[in-house]
Amino acid sequence: MKIITDSGADLSFEDCQQIGVTMVPLKVEVDGVSYQAGVDIDTEHFYDLMDASPVMPITSTPSIGDFAEVYQKFADEGEEILSIHISSGLSGTFNVAKQAAEMVKNARIHLIDTLTLSAGQAWQVTAAAKMQQAGKSLDEIIAKLGQIQAATTTHFTLPDLKYLIAGGRISHLRGLLASMLGIKPVIEVSKE
């Protein structure tokens, strides 16, 4: 069995290699320069570039072809595939992976919508890899991922509100008032 994920898990390419997971990276464009998240730009560098750029970065999902190529490679090797992805409520990545899976006819692909991102997604990917290395069956791994999903709530705090304002998540006025009062929101990732 092969485990595949995307860079929404905040695992580097090297992290994935160490645990035997294949990563299909999301794409990020900052100031006209394109990067593959987790491959040629890490989270810290991304935030540094964001802080220095007057323009909001553009993120995009991997292409259907990116996933189909990886799926086809492992299908041709006779591998069953467990593909674990960033929440479908936060990104189109899961749906792109699903479309790619439907294109690869000779593959046995099991798609998991983690219902989260970042550390919550990384936890699921890492747990699946450890269970695989321990010789657990695919059914056992999928059941455990369901338990982890049920037990996981992902929260974030932000040092300031400028990205929420720029991204239209909160109004400029509310952002200005919250900033003046020193309010730093705690954001919970919804499982819906």
Q: Which stretches of residues belong to each language-model region?
A:
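A general structural signal for well-ordered alpha-helical segments in protein cores
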Residues: 43-46, 67, 97, 125
